[in-house]
Amino acid sequence: KQQKKVKSPSEVTTDHLQQAKIYGDQGDYENSFIELSFALRTFLFHQFDIPKENFSNEQIIDKLEQSGLSNQALTQQLRQLLNRFEMVLYAPSMKKDQWKLTWEEVCLWIKQFDKA
């Protein structure tokens, strides 16, 4: 029987990031941010066991610190990213200006763990 290949967490994360870029390039900033959020949440879930839903930014940061991520710079970057996701929720017009930067920062943030 043909085994359906299960994607690794990093493949799933990468898929979301690629999709976010496609949406952004097409001017669909709404969906771009949704995909970026999925990418980040998928990564946090698999890397740090942080639930994908119903978790406030503060809870995410707390959980990161509990899980032994003592790198303040990384924690700070994530905090800024999460704040930006929140900001564009309340100010959707900012998505157009922010998606590219957000995309780059999510990619960079996740990449730092490949080395770690």
Stretches with model-predicted labels:
Residues 1-116:
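Solvent-exposed, low-complexity, intrinsically disordered
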